[in-house]
């Protein structure tokens, strides 16, 4: 993808660096991104459908709107030309993942590393990345027949946990899969592409880190946990009724809670983050840029298992607006992921380093 990056950098070269717009698709964490850009003095552009426009108008975070009928219109040359005319740097989030396979058609400077986003959405490549980083991981089952003990079944892409389920045997896998298909939570193709991991009992913790090429350091910006349907509702249903109703919990993410971790556990998170960043430089030049999230579980012995990584901003960072304990300690001012991204772009522009942040 080196030739593609050269094309992107050529577009960036023609930009008026004094009049950059920060842009993103109007969903996921756009409020975070656009507000952060405005806090750092940038003009902003929101690419959204007419229906979603009212959200970003009501919060006053978008200076300009580019209205599309579908987010895939972002790949349309006329839309891209309009954004290039505004000197737009795109900030990717989870809603961009649906278009990753078509990134070759997206000739716009994007903050971060689009090749790492491809690694993120490919389960096998993501696991290779994590294994090479030396992190502790749950066991992977290659096929349902290998399942022994509790296992969680997941699907490719950023589905927000939709349709994930837990099983304890091959028979249960096929039984619940059929049930999920009937409910419309997953499709037949999803079952074939499912990833089956050992289910570690423990506390799920999501670390939102930032790698700064300007400072050459890893920063912890926020920590969160997820509020999931229907898993987090089961505590309200008596055990007898759960059995009688044959309830199978699902893990669709509805929202997020902020978390402050025991300080002694942070070293495991930083070691994992540093290893992941180092390996990223080997697998996809120039390596990690900006926001990334390490999704983990701490077991009863407080050992950290990493089960997933996102090479971009995640929605859990929204709990850190206007600041989190970690970002405040580091910066001594209100700082959250959207603002941290914009701050990096501003610093890089001042130091003539923008090319190191863009792919």
Swiss-Prot record:
Pathway it works in: Purine metabolism; IMP biosynthesis via de novo pathway; 5-formamido-1-(5-phospho-D-ribosyl)imidazole-4-carboxamide from 5-amino-1-(5-phospho-D-ribosyl)imidazole-4-carboxamide (formate route): step 1/1
Keyword Phosphoprotein: no
Keywords per UniProt: ATP-binding, Ligase, Magnesium, Manganese, Metal-binding, Nucleotide-binding, Purine biosynthesis
EC top class, as a word: ligase
Any Gene Ontology biological process: 'de novo' IMP biosynthetic process
Cofactor details (free text): Binds 1 Mg(2+) or Mn(2+) ion per subunit.
Signal peptide range: none
Gene3D superfamilies linked to this entry: 3.40.50.20, ATP-grasp fold, A domain, ATP-grasp fold, B domain
Ranges for domain ATP-grasp: 115-346
Binding site for Mg(2+): 295, 308
A Pfam family it matches: DUF1246
Molecular function terms from GO: ATP binding; ligase activity, forming carbon-nitrogen bonds; magnesium ion binding
UniProt-listed Enzyme Commission number(s): 6.3.4.23
Stretches assigned to coiled coil: none
Catalyzed reactions per annotation: 5-amino-1-(5-phospho-beta-D-ribosyl)imidazole-4-carboxamide + formate + ATP = 5-formamido-1-(5-phospho-D-ribosyl)imidazole-4-carboxamide + ADP + phosphate
Biological role stated in the UniProt entry: Catalyzes the ATP- and formate-dependent formylation of 5-aminoimidazole-4-carboxamide-1-beta-d-ribofuranosyl 5'-monophosphate (AICAR) to 5-formaminoimidazole-4-carboxamide-1-beta-d-ribofuranosyl 5'-monophosphate (FAICAR) in the absence of folates.
Family, per entry: Belongs to the phosphohexose mutase family.
Name recorded for this polypeptide: 5-formaminoimidazole-4-carboxamide-1-(beta)-D-ribofuranosyl 5'-monophosphate synthetase
Species of origin: Archaeoglobus fulgidus (strain ATCC 49558 / DSM 4304 / JCM 9628 / NBRC 100126 / VC-16)
Gene coding for it: purP
